[in-house]
Amino acid sequence: MSYDAYQMRPGQGRDYARQQRQQRSYQLSDDPLRQPGAPYANPAGGYPSSASMNPENPFYAAENPSFQTLAPATSEGHATYTYEEDKIPLTDSADEKYGFSQNGHSTYNLASQSGFPPSTPCGGPSSYSSALGPEDSASQVAWAKRQQAPKRGLTKKIQLTRGHWIVDHPVPTAVKNSVESRWSQGNRTQEFTHMRYTAATCDPDEFTLENGWSLRTSQQYGRDTELLIAITYYNEDRILLARTLHGVMLNIRDICKSKSSKFWRRSAEEGRPGWQRIVVSLIFDGIDPCDKEVLDLLATVGVYQDGVMKRKVDGKDTVAHLFEYTTQLSVDPTPALIQPHADDASNLVPVQMIFCLKQKNSKKINSHRWLFNALGRHLQPELCVLIDAGTKPGHKSLYYLWEAFYNNANLGGACGEIHAMIKNGRKLINPLVAAQNFEYKMSNILDKPLESTFGYVSVLPGAFSAYRFRAIQGRPLQQYFHGDHTLADRLGKKGLHGMDIFTKNMFLAEDRILCFELVAKAGDKWTLTYVKPSKGETDVPEGAAELISQRRRWLNGSFAASIYSLVHFFRIYKSNHGIIRLFFLHIQALYNAIVLLFSWFALANLWLTFSIIIEFLPDELLKNSSHTTLVVFHWINQAAKWIYVFFLVLQFVLALGNRPKGEKPTYIASFIVFGILGLYLIFVSLWLTLKALLETSVSGNIWHTLFNQTTGVLIAALAATFGIYLIASILYADPWHMVTSFPQYMMIAPSFINILNVYAFCNLHDVSWGTKGSDKADALPTVDTKKDKSTEPGTVEEIERHQDDIDETFKAVVSRAVAPFKPAETVEKPTMDDSNKTFRTRLVAFWLLTNGALTVAIENVNGLNTGLTNKQIEQQQSSKQSTYFRIILWATFGLSAFRFIGCLIYWVKRNSTRCFRKT
C-alpha cells in the first residue's frame, strides 16, 4: 500500500481515494470473494471472523429501543460475552463474537461468579472472557506492553510522506460495521474503515500544508467546517470524559436532526449532512498524566489504537500523536456502549473526530495552540467551542451557542451557563459544594447578564465557551499565546522569560486576556455575550484543600487580568466600536474599577463589619438587660474577636509555608470556625433589624428608622443580600438555590475572603509553570528509515497486524472500557517536608496564641464596668496596667542582676586562681 502525502486542494479527495484503491496490495476483508450481503466465513472454521452490525442484515431489528447499551461487567472487573437465547437467533453470524447482536441487542453480560466463563449455545467458551485484572487499564506497565509491535503479521515496507509518518490503520470489524448503511454505502473513502495516525514531529505553528501535514476532513475529503468542538483533557477519569464526549455527540445529533434550523436543514438538502460540517477534537495534555482507561474508551469508539504510536521518526521526537476517525459509537457515563439501530430516528450521527495526544505535558495554553494554530488552520472553522473534560453540555447547548453567532455578525465570543454538578441535590449536603453552587447560580443571574448588556463579558470560562475563529486571529491569539512556556525561548523578552511575576499571574486567567484583546481588537467591533439557554454542568471541588488550590489560580489570575484590562483600556479607542458602545464600555470600566477596589479591601471590611456589628448586641439590643447579661455578652464578643484574629493570622502562617493538602485538618477547622462566626454575625444583624422594624411599627416613624446610622445600613445590606438575590432568581425562574444553597453560602462566605484570598495573595509567586516529564513515552517504539540504494527514498519495515488480531485485541479493550468504574481512592500521605512544616506551623501558631492571649488579657484586665464613669474606668485600667509593667520591669532587673552575679562569680573565680594555674 502506498502512503503518499494527502497534499491536495479541496475536491481532490475522491480522486485520491480512487487511486489508493487501485494501488492496494492487500484485501481489507477476511474473505475477498464474499458477495455483497453474504455472511463472512472463517476458513479455519469455528467462530466467524467478523461482526455484521449491518442494518441490511435481516436479523437487525428496527423495533428495538433507541440507544441499547452494553450491560456493565461485574464489580470484580471481569466480563464475559454470551448469547441471549431469548433474543438472538442461533445463527452462524459473527455478531456475538464482537459483542453486537444481529437484532440490535448488546450481548455483553455479567461474568460468571463461579470463576469460569459461561458456555455459549455453540458449546464453546465465550470469546469475550477477560483475563485482565481490574487494575489492568490503570497500570502503566500493562499499557506499555500494549504499545509494542505485534509478534505476528505480514511485514510491509512503508514510505514516509515527505518525511512524515502518516499511516492508515484498519479499525476493528465491529467498529466498522457499527456505521449505518446509509452513511457507509457509497462512501468510497476509508473514512469508516480506517483510522489515520500521524506522528507530528513539529511545533503546532509548523503543522501546515506547506510542510507536508494534512487532515483528512479538509484536505482528503474537501469539507468545510462550520463547528470545531475542542475537548481539552489533563488527567480526568474515563467517566468524566464520557460525560463530556457523549454529551457532545448528543448535541451534534440534535443539531444535525433539527428541523427548526434552516441552515442545517438546507445543508442536508444540498447533500452535505450536518455532521460533515462539525469536527470534534480531543486534545490531551501529555501521555504521562493521562488516565490509560480513557484511552480504552477512545479505542472502543474507534479513534485510538494501542501499538500504533511512534516516539521518534528518523531521530525527531514526536510532539503530538494525531488520530482521525469518523465514528457512530459512543460510551455514556454509566458506562455503557451506545450503538445505532436500524431506522431509529434517535441514533447518533457519525462524528468526525481528531484525537491529539501530546507526548509531553505542556499546559492548557499549548493545547489551545494545537487547536487554533494547527488544527484550526487546516479546518478554518467558523466557530470554535471550548469544553473542559468533565463538563457536560446540556440539551441543545451547542446549538444555542451556534445560533447566537449565526444571528449576530459582530459577535466574537460567547459562553453558556455553567452550573455545579449536584447529582439530584445529593452533593448539596457538602456545604462547600452548596456554596459553590450558589456562586455559580448568582454569577449566571446577576454578573453575566450585566456584562452581556455592555457587550463585554470579562471572562468567558474556558470550561464552556465559544469564539468566532476569524475574530481571534491576529493580536488576540498572539497575546494569548505569550503564556505558552514552549514559546518562551522563541519569544524572548515577550515570553515567559521576560515577564515579571505579576504578568505571569495574569496568564493564570488566560481566558480573561483573550476576552479583552478580542473586544479591543483594532479596526473591529467584536462583542461578547452570555447565552442563557446554553447550559453546561461541571464538577466542583468537594474538599477544602482542592478548593483552596483551585481558587489560588483563579483569584491571582483574575486580579492581574483585571489590572491589565483597566491599564490598557485606552486601546479600546483603536477599535471600530460605535459611540454608544464606547460610552457603555466606559461605564463598565468604572464599575470594574470599583469592584476591584472593594475586593482589595475585603479583608479589612469584613473584620470591621464583624467587630462593629457584634458590639451592637450589648450596646443596642441588651442595654436594658441585667449587669450579668451584659458581662456575659461582653466576654462572648471579646472571645469571638480573639478567635477571629487568631484564625486570620493563622491563615497567613499556613499560606506562607504549607501546602493545603499537607494541612487539611487545620484548614477544615478554619472553615468551621469562620462559619460559626459568620452565623453569629447574621444572628446579631437579623436581631438588630427585627428590633428596629418592631420599633418602627410602634412609633410609625419609618424614615427615621431607615436613615438611622445604626440600623439603616443594616436594613439596606440585608435587603441587598436577601431581597435582590431572591427577586432576581425568581425573575429568571431559577429560585431553588436560595433554599438549597443560600444558607451554606452565608456560612462559607467569610472563608472565601479570610482563607481563599489570603492564601492566593500569599502565594502570588507560585505561577505553576513547571511541567512534568513524559517518561511514559519511552515505551513507544521509534521509526527509522532504511535505504537500499542512495537514490531511492527511505522506507520503514512495519509489521501489519492481521484483522483477526485487531478484533481479538478489541475484545479486551471493550471489556475494560465498559467495566464498572471505581474511583481510585488515592490517600495522599504528608511528605517529610509537610510534616516538618506542620510542626513549624503549629509551634508558631501556639506562640502567637499565647502572646496574643497575654496581650488581650492585660488590655482588658478590668472587664466590663457599667457602674463606673469613664474617668474611673481609665484610672483603674491605668493602675492595673502600671502594676503589670512594674512586675515586668522588676523581673527584667532581677534577671539582669542574676546574670551579673554569675558573671561576677566567674570573674572572681578565674582571677583568684590565676596564681595556682599550672603552666
Curated annotation (Swiss-Prot):
Its main location: membrane. The chain crosses the membrane at residues 594-614, 630-650, 668-688, 713-733, 742-762, 843-863, 887-919. Keywords: Cell membrane, Cell wall biogenesis/degradation, Cytoplasmic vesicle, Glycoprotein, Glycosyltransferase, Membrane, Transferase, Transmembrane, Transmembrane helix. It comes from the Eukaryota. One of its GO terms (biological process) is cell wall organization. Glycans are attached at residues 187, 556. Residues 1-69, 109-134 are annotated as: Disordered. It catalyses: [(1->4)-N-acetyl-beta-D-glucosaminyl](n) + UDP-N-acetyl-alpha-D-glucosamine = [(1->4)-N-acetyl-beta-D-glucosaminyl](n+1) + UDP + H(+). Induction: Expression is slightly lower in the yeast form than in the mycelium and shows a maximal expression in the log phase at about 14-18 h of incubation. Its EC number is 2.4.1.16. It holds the Pfam family Chitin_synth_1N. GO terms for cellular component: cell periphery; cell septum; cytoplasmic vesicle membrane; plasma membrane. The keyword Protein transport does not apply. It is a multi-pass membrane protein. Residues 11-30 have a biased composition (Low complexity). Polymerizes chitin, a structural polymer of the cell wall and septum, by transferring the sugar moiety of UDP-GlcNAc to the non-reducing end of the growing chitin polymer. Belongs to the chitin synthase family. Class III subfamily. This is Chitin synthase 1. It comes from Mycosarcoma maydis. The gene is CHS1.
